[in-house]
C-alpha cells in the first residue's frame, strides 16, 4: 500500500514510522513536510529533531517537501507525490485542516485526518466545526474519516502497544485505515460513528486542562476521579446532542483518550493546566510548551456549541473562564464545588 502522511509533526512522524516499520505489510510510506528546511534535516539526519527527537527514521521512510501549489507531473511535484497513493493521511493541526482538504478535494482515494478539536468559528455569526463538518464544506466528495484514540506519539514511535479507532461513514475508509496501520504493536478498531469519535477527541483536550489544573493544585486523587467522571458525562451529553451514539464515549476515543490525556504527563493539554496551577499566564504556558495544545483553541467552541444546543457543561465552562482570565484557578475550583446538589446524570 502506498501511504502519504501530510504533516511532519510528532504524530504524523510517529504514524508514518509505525506504518513503515510493519514487517508484515510492506507499505511504501512517504512523510511530507511543509518546511523544506525541516525535510532536509530529516533526510540528512534520519531524525525529526524538532518534534520527535531521539527516534530514528528508517531508510525506507521517504521524506518530501513538495510544494502544495505544484500539481504538475514533475518528479518533485506535490501532484506526483500523491499520484497513485492508496491512502492520504492529513497530520496537520485543526487550524490547517481546511486548507489541506481544499488541496485534496479532487482525490478519489481514502483520506483520513489525525487532528482532534474544533475549528475556531470563522465569524461572530458562525459556530466552530468538527473535522467532518469542515470536510463537508471544503471537500464534500472525499471518502474521508479520522484516526483517533489514546495515543502519545512518542510511544507509538517506540513501538509500544497502542489501540486506535478508525472512524468513517465509508466502509472503504475504515477498512483501508485498518489495513494500513494494524500491526503487532498497533491495534486498530473500526467505528462508523464519526461524530462521536470526533467529539471525544475534541472535548477530552479541554477536560485534560481541568485535570492538569487539579493535579497542579494538589487537590488529590478523589478530585481527579470526579473531574474525569463528570467530564465524561459532559462529553457524552454534547456528543449525543450532536448526533453521536452514547456508547461511543465508553470506547477508545472517549473514555480511553480522556484518561490518557488527562493523566499522562506527555499530554500537552494537561501541561497547560499544570502550568496555570503554578501561576503562569496562558501565554507563558503556551510559549513554554512549544507545541499546539488543541484544548486551548477548542475550549470556547465547545462551550459555544453546547450553549447553542442547550447542553450543560460546567467543567468546560470553568476552563474557558480560566483561559480567558475571568477566574483564578482556586476560584474555578470553588465555582464547580459550589454548584447546587443534583441527581447524578450521565
Curated annotation (Swiss-Prot):
MF GO annotations: glycerol-3-phosphate dehydrogenase [NAD(P)+] activity; NAD binding
Catalytic activity: sn-glycerol 3-phosphate + NAD(+) = dihydroxyacetone phosphate + NADH + H(+); sn-glycerol 3-phosphate + NADP(+) = dihydroxyacetone phosphate + NADPH + H(+)
Chief place of localization: cytoplasm
Catalytic residues identified in the record: 204 (proton acceptor)
Listed SUPFAM superfamilies: 6-phosphogluconate dehydrogenase C-terminal domain-like, NAD(P)-binding Rossmann-fold domains
UniProt entry tagged with the keyword tRNA processing: no
UniProt binding sites for NADPH: 11, 34, 116, 153, 268, 292, 294
Residues the record lists as binding sn-glycerol 3-phosphate: 116, 149, 151, 204, 257, 267-269
Lineage top rank: taxon: Bacteria
EC number: 1.1.1.94
PANTHER family: GLYCEROL-3-PHOSPHATE DEHYDROGENASE, GLYCEROL-3-PHOSPHATE DEHYDROGENASE [NAD(+)] 2, CHLOROPLASTIC
Family: Belongs to the NAD-dependent glycerol-3-phosphate dehydrogenase family.
Protein name per the record: Glycerol-3-phosphate dehydrogenase [NAD(P)+]
The organism of origin for this protein: Albidiferax ferrireducens (strain ATCC BAA-621 / DSM 15236 / T118) (Rhodoferax ferrireducens)
